[in-house]
Amino acid sequence: IDTKKFQSVFDYLMDWYLHQNVKFVIPIRELGRKRIFNVDEIKYFETYYNDLEIVTIDDQHFMAHVKNRYKLRPVLKSRWFMQVNQSVLVNMKCIDFLTDRNVILKSREVFPTSRKTLFQNHLLFEKFLKEQEEKELLKNGESKN
């Protein structure tokens, strides 16, 4: 099958996907530390290629991709997961879309290749952290009075 025929359709889908669902890219280690934000609940879904993680932060639901290091086929590793050090947080609405095996692979191919997207997402994540810090300061300020 010549996949180039579908490239425009796929570009359109990915544009929609990024606009609708991606909140920001968050480094897995930050999520692991649970530094500032309260993680109310974490649920894991294991799929053939990835672990999907439902994360609840301040009553908002996000979904993270966590690279499945154990079950990943070596052949796919370099091709699909090349620069992925991040897990991608998206709306939970997208769960059905993401649990489709092929869509996971295709979407993972697109995210890391766009450096611009990574930078934009990184800035959004920084902004998110600042907002959380400000919330904490306000909470602490109120409790002291």
Where are these regions (language model features)?
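Eukaryotic intrinsically disordered, low-complexity regulatory linkers and tails enriched in Ser/Thr/Pro
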Residues: 1-34, 75, 117-145
